[in-house]
Structures are given as structure tokens and as C-alpha cells.
UniProtKB/Swiss-Prot annotation:
Homodimer. Pathway: One-carbon metabolism; tetrahydrofolate interconversion. NADP(+) binds at G166, R167, S168, S191, T232. Its EC number is 1.5.1.5, 3.5.4.9. Gene3D superfamilies: Leucine Dehydrogenase, chain A, domain 1 (3.40.50.10860), NAD(P)-binding Rossmann-like Domain (3.40.50.720). Transmembrane segments: none annotated. This is Bifunctional protein FolD. Belongs to the tetrahydrofolate dehydrogenase/cyclohydrolase family. Keywords: Amino-acid biosynthesis, Histidine biosynthesis, Hydrolase, Methionine biosynthesis, Multifunctional enzyme, NADP, One-carbon metabolism, Oxidoreductase, Purine biosynthesis. The gene is folD. One of its GO terms (molecular function) is methylenetetrahydrofolate dehydrogenase (NADP+) activity.
């Protein structure tokens, strides 16, 4: 069996057009572009590249991006003050924190100063709680992109058995909740799960978010299953691979996302969708 490739790049182009139209409508309603503030602490090259990519995406869709670059030695109080100022700024519609924060800084303190209605990552305790209650408003972008990929490619989630490999607060847990809300029967697997393969072989949908290259092999996958790979692991030679042994699993699965080019492109569009939602909700549009 050769799996159908769930092409995130192609889907992202379709979603870009939808987002651009919605942003154009918002611009006429608020007489300015919807604006995202991206807060980066330190000068990690990968983080800097990502901020630039968000800036380019905003410009291409008609939104605005304000990048706030803070030195790595920024004190906790100063970071919290920056986030509080952005939260109070009426011309900032959404805030994105570049994670993880450098050593010595704690996320909980920063989130306490972040306006939940501007939380574009969906990680504020209020937004996480709403998601857990089945009333999501701003949903974490990466898992939202995985669900959108399945929905747009016509993959039925209702009534299916699903496994999420990984339990992070940004990807694994919210992905499990989104699958549950789509009426899947969900199992969360992690580093303490005995015999991971035995669990996965029973599942129609596998979402991999463990951060371990090649963790999921072909013998772990039920024939015809849908495999969503959130992994972004950079190898010593600079290449990027997912958590799934793509070539081998693609011969068994019914559908699979590649890395790169699968969930990643859709994740960024989900960020823009959250910006649109945040702007509309905050301004009562």
C-alpha cells in the first residue's frame, strides 16, 4: 500500500487565500491592519528565522507584525512588563511568545500578564481550560493544523480510535482534546507507555508529537491508518525529519503527512486564523 500524502503546502495556499480575504474585510472594519506582536528573548537563529517568516506571512496577507527582540539576559520582571504593555495596547490584536524561554525565565509568570484574548498560541490557562471544556476560542496552532489537514482531506475522525504520542501542553494534550471533540476515542501515549506499538496497531489515527526522530516504525502502524507527524527534528547533517519513519510507514498507512511540508505550513496559517479570531472577538466584530 502506498499512502496518500497529506500535502500541507498545497493546503496552506488554499487557506492563505481564505485568510487574506478575511483580513481585507477586517481592515475595512477597523481602519488598520490586524496586528500581531511577536516577543523573542535572545538571539537564537532558528527563532529569529521564524519571526521573520511570520513577518513575511503577515505582509503577504495584509496583516501587520511588530517584532519585539529582547536580550537573552532580560529579567523576568522586564519580560512580564513588556507582555503587560502589549496586552494593554489597543492597537495590538494578538501576542505570540517565542518558546521555549531562556533559562532563568518562567512561562507561568509571563502568562499571568498576557491578556487571554490576545493569546495566539492558545496556552493561557483560560484558553487551555476552555479547550478542555469543549469551548475553544484560541486553539494551539500546531494541533489545530493537524485537525484542519484531516478535515480538508476528507478523513473521517468520528468514531475512530486515535492515539497521540506525546503529552506536551502545546501539541500533544490539545491534539488529544481536539480529537476527542471530533468524536474520536483517544489514547495518549508517552515515554512511560509500555509497548507503544501494541497501542498504535489498534488505532485508525496516529498523531506523533514526541520529538524523537523515527520513533514510529512501520510495524507499529495499522494498515490504512492516518498518520499525522508533528515532529520537527533536525539531524546532524542539517536535514529535518519527523517522529515517523516516513518511507517505511508510507507503505503501510492510508494517509500520512511528510516532514517538512506537512503540518508545518498549515500551523502558520492557523496562527493567522487565531489573529483574525482574536481581533474580531476583542473588538466585538
Amino acid at each position: 500500500m502506498s499512502a496518500r500524502i497529506l500535502d500541507g503546502k498545497a493546503l496552506a495556499q488554499e487557506l492563505r487565500a481564505e485568510a487574506a480575504a478575511q483580513i481585507a474585510e477586517l481592515r475595512t472594519q477597523i481602519d488598520r491592519p490586524p496586528t500581531i506582536a511577536v516577543v523573542q528573548v535572545g538571539d537564537d537563529p532558528a527563532a529569529t528565522r521564524y519571526v521573520r517568516s511570520i513577518d513575511r506571512l503577515c505582509q503577504s496577507l495584509g496583516a501587520a507584525c511588530r517584532a519585539i527582540a529582547l536580550p537573552a539576559e532580560t529579567a523576568q520582571a522586564d519580560l512580564e512588563a513588556t507582555v503587560a504593555t502589549l496586552s494593554a495596547d489597543d492597537r495590538i490584536d494578538g501576542i505570540l511568545l517565542q518558546l521555549p524561554l531562556p533559562a532563568g525565565l518562567t512561562l507561568d509568570g509571563v502568562l499571568s500578564r498576557l491578556a487571554p484574548e490576545k493569546d495566539l498560541d492558545g496556552i493561557h490557562p483560560i484558553n487551555a481550560g476552555l479547550l478542555a471544556q469543549g469551548r475553544p476560542t484560541l486553539t494551539p496552532n500546531t494541533p489545530a493544523g493537524g485537525i484542519e489537514l484531516m478535515r480538508r482531506y476528507g478523513i473521517d475522525i468520528r468514531g475512530r480510535r486515535a492515539a497521540v504520542v506525546g503529552r506536551s501542553a502545546i501539541v500533544g494534550r490539545p491534539m488529544a482534546l481536539l480529537l476527542l471533540q471530533a468524536d474520536a476515542t483517544v489514547t495518549i501515549c508517552h515515554s512511560r507507555t509500555p509497548d507503544l506499538g501494541a497501542v498504535l496497531r489498534e488505532c485508525d489515527i496516529i498523531a506523533a508529537a514526541a520529538g524523537r526522530p523515527g520513533l514510529i516504525t512501520a510495524d507499529m502502524v495499522k494498515p490504512g491508518a492516518t498518520v499525522i507527524d508533528f515532529g520537527t527534528n533536525v539531524l546532524a547533517d542539517g536535514s529535518m525529519v519527523g517522529d515517523v519513519d516516513f518511507a517505511a510507514v508510507a507503505e503501510v498507512a492510508g494517509a500520512i503527512t511528510p516532514v517538512p511540508g506537512g503540518t508545518g505550513p498549515v500551523t502558520n496559517i492557523m496562527l493567522m486564523r487565531n489573529l483574525i479570531t482574536a481581533t474580531r472577538t476583542r473588538l466585538g466584530i
